[in-house]
Amino acid sequence: MEIQLWRSILCPYELAVRELEVKFNHIIDECKENDIYCPIEQVEGRVKSVSSILEKMQRKQIPMERMEEEVEDIAGVRIICQFEEDIETVASLIQKRSDMTIKSEKNYLKHIKQSGYRSYHLIIHYTVDTVKGPKKLQAEIQIRTMAMNFWATIEHSLQYKYKGDMPEHVAER
């Protein structure tokens, strides 16, 4: 697929990530302004790279015409909390919002992955306004603590990015 076509596909997702980052960072600002405890420590967002999208489509055998329906994490936002109890609070805040709807939830806190990965994932439907009109798309929101984020970053690198020979005792974890 040509570069210009990829840009046009990913542009609304970039907008969604920027908007979601602003909205969740606003919660932090609002808590500070009102001198109340904030369950959100940090917000980060990203749009999946073209190579990562293609790799996922190949791995899951997703045809190009189904990409936007089946690759749910083209847009991603990670919300970092200080404490595990904050995760439920943040999920509840998101569930109550009128500007996004929850499509699905995956609770890797109750159902820890074999690798030790722990996090709370929401797939949301979110609408952005583009020059061509409104576009409803999907985004993944990951909610986790700083400690969980540290482990998840290492686990992700070992699973998807690391190209060397992994020691057997590390692969088993």
What are these regions (language model features)?
Residues 1-72:
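Charge-rich, low-complexity segments
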Residues 68, 81-173:
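Long beta-strand-rich cores associated with HINT superfamily self-processing modules
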Residues 73-77:
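Short amphipathic alpha-helical segments
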